[in-house]
């Protein structure tokens, strides 16, 4: 840059080219006194700073350049300060500039101290001239920093020292900008480089100053107003925490500004100061809060519109204790700290929150536009359900009850919610399986929109704890509670249930209506328990766990559902063995309606092994689920149903309970779920199952179509697979067709286990076993007369075959099998509470009529207490607990119920249902059932009872092969068979005890009977061979 000499002339018209924003119209500026002096220093400054303070006279080229440059720079840089903000201080008109200079000199006398001089020559200037020249230059050179630097305490030199590099770079480029391609831009860039550190320093200083002020402020601002101001400022500066739900939940419990330190933390203070500076807000004024905005911030998604819980802490006077006003709605909760907070995100789940449950469901249709928001739904059909509801609570209009509706159990997410929640028009389950809810039926069990009509209030998925379907039925209230609620609805459900039945043949498993989640664990059977549905679908039955259980996948849950303490260990394997067995829980739903243990046993009705019947179970147990698990489908279901109260029935976990079997029996309809009468009587689901070609046969129906997953799948097993197997027959017998499976011999539809004749036609368990055993078609007269009489004669007299100790795997399980659950099925189907007798193991020959049973030797002297070893005739295979179809593994001594009057193909299933014991027993039942082939009737009861292929089959098939040499060996085969079968076992719904049917047998014979049943194990005799083959094939 042409050296601009520091001559007075040069200084006369100093061009503050140094500052890119400066316009060099210095020729317009009037000369100032002392120009020469200032010029001396200034010229140097101009040169050194490349501000090109060039004398217009001497350096016209320079001046011209500077003119040009500054016009450009002024145009470009003048509008921008170091950080890009428009600089208004560089008005380079002569008047404006002079005024600016004067202003700078007058107001910013300390600029010289605060801002680094453009050149080191400044230090040599005289104080006065130098100050004037410096100020003049500085005003043009550093206008953007005048305001920020005005308050600075450090001198420019110090600042330069702090950031010498940026300043030096800027100086360098300012000097050489003329030689650079992008001169103005480079100068501006270097200026910015220098300015940044200055700004940073300025912020730091201001922060420090603010911090010091804030530290001293608390002592000074002792007045209430000062405190309020502070509190308000804090509130403003501190954005409300959107995640702070507690504030909104209960303001009383929230710490208020009073609890906060009045002195903001340094960070807070600096932030506040910055905010005030940015917003030009003054600390002197108490900010008036826009409460609406704050409230909007605090709006919490809610399932139901509710008064906001204002975070009073966010208000100016939040620190003041809130005065309780009687008129305040939320004061009640405030006054009563013990009361649960009425939070929108309370555990009460929005009934209509569309969640994963409503995947295929039309929540609106299902719920009839039910919304938690619309209490008007009281008038909706749910009202109808309440009308039928015996409880005033339900009649109150629970459907509109926000609490219930939103409660997790009623949430759309839960299969059972709608049923429980009156929110559904027809039934709490209207959404899931309401007549409207064909979608439910079609949709997967877990429909996202199950109970979430769009109309519902704010649905807060995040804030509202939604019980998960998977969790099961009792999310918040326990399945039973819901059931109780549903029970009242049952009448409504009946009407609804019919429609529902068409839509949802299955329970949670196959049932779109009900999420499978509910199916597994909850003793949803209690839903089935609500016999209120009797004629109609029991909402409980519909969406009950059992539904899930119905479905093969659910069956495992079902097993859990029926896990009765100790029984589970031996049955754990079995629990999943047959989904249908497990599904028996679903029977609970339908059975009450059906009153038929056979219906209860329907879960057994289908063979989980059948590909169409239980996908989950089939996958898990390709050969068929282990039959060890008490075929709750048969017995367990029955016992579940036996629980007269569907509410209670869901929980009846002990097979020993006189499950509803007797109740079911009293309602004896054709046992087959497919039985039209039953379907009418039973849940619509049951009917649906019957009608559905894919529905399992009677079993499904019995298990109340809801849970009849099989209804959705072909019941029949693969043509070649297990044709002889009871399970396959049962599942396949009528499953493939929409019509309920009917025994081609006795025409019963309720057998616990379906078998096939050589032609592949379905036979009930009794007929199938009889045919296999004797090679002759079972005489229909035998169905009730002969077998029944036998049961009465021997079974009735016998209190309980011995204690059916659940024989886990081995005779090793002695009479006192680890879980020797001596469950007294107090009443069998006969309702005669047989004396609960623990027959010494020796008394009862444990026979594993089924492979599964054999797996656990009779050692579960549960059957007879006789271990395989103890019974000479019983071998390990026959060791399976003889005590009943319950299950070879665990035979639980169950007081034999008086023989039921329902012998015959269905009788077996009934008797199976009749006696229910813990899972153990169930298993034992299975094994016993397998083991209990003593007679066709017995087989029917026990074999049906046991749905596990081996056990179930064993019950039926093995039964036929009683080992004369077994405990019953002394008895003639016929006697054994009659004993095993008679013992009131047949009449009794198939007791889980299975051969425990032996329960019905005379005391002496009970063990023997058990033994006989067990003795009819593999090798039990020639008949055993056929029977064994039968049960073996069935257990495949």
UniProtKB/Swiss-Prot annotation:
GATA-type zinc finger segments: 743-767
Sequence repeats by residue range: 49-55, 87-92, 105-110
GO molecular function: DNA-binding transcription factor activity, RNA polymerase II-specific; RNA polymerase II cis-regulatory region sequence-specific DNA binding; zinc ion binding
Biased composition (Polar residues): 652-661, 723-736, 802-827, 927-961
Region: 3 X approximate repeats, residue numbers: 49-110
Bias (Low complexity): 1-17, 45-56, 100-114, 703-714, 828-861, 868-899, 1000-1023
A GO CC term attached to the entry: nucleus
Subcellular location: Nucleus
Domain of life (superkingdom): Eukaryota
Pfam families, alphabetized: GATA, GATA_AreA
GO BP terms: negative regulation of transcription by RNA polymerase II; nitrate assimilation; positive regulation of transcription by RNA polymerase II
Keywords per UniProt: Activator, DNA-binding, Metal-binding, Nitrate assimilation, Nucleus, Repeat, Transcription, Transcription regulation, Zinc, Zinc-finger
Key word Cytoplasm present: no
Keyword Zinc: yes
Listed Basic and acidic residues bias regions: 23-34
Region ranges (Disordered): 1-126, 207-240, 256-298, 318-351, 590-743, 792-976, 1000-1028
Induction: By lack of a primary nitrogen source.
Signal sequence extent: none
Sequence intervals crossing the membrane: none
SMART domains from the UniProt entry: ZnF_GATA
Alphabetized PANTHER family for the sequence: BOX A-BINDING FACTOR-RELATED, TRANSCRIPTION FACTOR GATA FAMILY MEMBER
Function field: Major nitrogen regulatory protein. During conditions of nitrogen limitation it turns on the expression of genes for enzymes which are required for the use of a variety of secondary nitrogen sources, including nitrates, purines, amino acids, and proteins.
Oligomer status and interactors: Interacts with nmr.
Protein name: Nitrogen catabolic enzyme regulatory protein
Taxonomic lineage: Eukaryota, Fungi, Dikarya, Ascomycota, Pezizomycotina
